[in-house]
Structure formats: C-alpha cells, structure tokens
Design a protein with these regions (language model features):
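Short, ligand-facing micro-motifs at secondary-structure edges
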Residues: 75-88, 102-128, 141-145, 153-162
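Short coil/turn segments at secondary-structure boundaries
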Residues: 21-25, 55-63, 159
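Non-catalytic DNA-recognition/assembly elements of restriction-modification systems
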Residues: 25-52, 174, 179, 183, ...
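Amphipathic alpha-helical coiled-coil/heptad-repeat segments
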Residues: 1-19, 149, 179-236
Length: 236
C-alpha cells in the first residue's frame, strides 16, 4: 500500500516525463515540480461542502428514507453500500451527491480514517453525513489521485494534534496542491495510474490470499497438535 501511494505521489507531483524542465514548488515535502505546473489551493479548482446533520430520531428504514453516506461506506477507495443508514429528515438539493463528487471522511474517532475518500458513481437521491464532506470539481479522477497521494497525507499530519483529528472545510480548502491544468496531461496521468494501481492491487490481493492460506494452515496445525491428532516428535 505504501508503494502504491509512492507511485501515485510521483505521478501527481513530477508528471510522467522524466526530461521535463523542473522548478521549486516552494513546498518542502513536494520539492521540484514540472515548470509548467502550478501550486494552487484546492479551493481554486473546485468546491467543497459539509454533510447533513441529523438526530437519532430521524433514522428510518430504506423504503421511507434517504440514504446517508458515512465513513463506513468508503472501503478500499470505493463506495460500499453494505452498511447503510437512512433518515426521514428533509434533505436540501445541495446536500445530495452527484456523479463525480469525491466523498471524504472529515471527522472520525480514528485519525487514520480521516481523509479517506472515494468517487461517487451512479447514486440518486443520496446524501452524506455531518462527519463527511464532498469535493466537486471538473477533473474528479485526477483530484482523487491527488487526495490519495502523500501530498494529502503530509498535509493532514501538519495540523493533526492529540486533540484535533478532523478536517475542517477551511483546512481542506486551503490545502496547497500541485496542479497541471492541461486536460490531456491530466488524462495521461489518470490512465497511467489506473493501470499501475490495478496492477499493484492485484499483487496485494494475491499476497493477502497467500497469507490467508498460511494462517489457515497454522490454525489447522495447532488444532491437530492440541487435540492429539499429531504428536510432537521427541528426541531420544
């Protein structure tokens, strides 16, 4: 996973052309960037919005309520609809998600979960909770990769403390990112990362399967010895 984040970070801060002329970004943890790229605050390339506040008494069932996306609905960088909550309260149109929105966890008891995000695909009449925010922009997949790079991780770490583990709208909007405005270059970076990340995910899944097999074998071996089905060899 750390290697995957490093690959993403390299692509969204250095580009794909190793011979590109570079300049200093002015951001210590980013270093040099391609000369024609810019350093912008993320609020300059899109808009963010905080989620719906609701009470426990607003909870209802699927047939009568509006689905509220929460932190648990983001799994492995994708939207998961296996743990759903519905509310009966009125939801304004500006609090309903649209295709291409980036859903971000902005507050959580676990600081490791703050900042996790996923792109909204085809969801209709769906809102998002108060501990979440959405970011709406013209290049969602490109920005999604920026938000899954070390740039975002370092930024979160710059203001997190032992008592502050939330991403406010102001903090998010003022985050400095490296940005290339050329849509063709954005598209090439996205295509490269789609392919590379798919390859890495396959390797990770394969390693996890191997570890699961070894864990099952270990449990089986322990069971056989503690139940006497196998005996521990004794050296005479």
């Amino acid at each position: 996973e750390d290697y995957k984040k490093s690959v993403i970070t390299e692509a969204v801060t250095k580009g794909l052309n190793p011979d590109a002329e570079m300049k200093d970004s002015g951001i210590e943890w980013i270093g040099e960037i391609p000369k024609h790229w810019k350093v912008l605050r993320i609020k300059n390339v899109g808009e963010y919005r905080n989620g719906l506040t609701y009470k426990p008494t607003d909870l209802t069932d699927e047939n009568t309520g509006t689905l509220v996306l929460r932190s648990s609905n983001i799994q492995d960088g994708k939207i998961s609809l296996n743990d759903n909550v519905y509310v009966s309260t009125f939801v304004r149109s500006d609090l309903k998600v649209k295709k291409g929105d980036i859903l971000i966890c902005s507050r959580n008891g676990s600081r490791e979960l703050v900042g996790k995000n996923a792109i909204i695909e085809d969801l209709k009449d769906v809102t998002f909770g108060a501990f979440m925010m959405i970011f709406r922009c013209n290049s969602p997949k490109y920005l999604y990769y920026i938000l899954n790079s070390k740039v975002f991780s370092y930024y979160l770490g710059s203001f997190f403390t032992s008592t502050i583990t939330q991403l406010t709208g102001s903090n998010f909007g003022n985050m400095k990112i490296v940005y290339v405005s050329d849509k063709l270059e954005q598209s090439k970076i996205v295509s490269y990362l789609d392919s590379k990340c798919s390859e890495i995910d396959s390797l990770i899944a394969d390693k996890k399967r191997q570890l699961d097999i070894l864990a099952d074998y270990k449990k089986s071996l322990i069971y056989e010895y503690v139940t006497g089905k196998k005996e521990v060899p004794v050296n005479e």
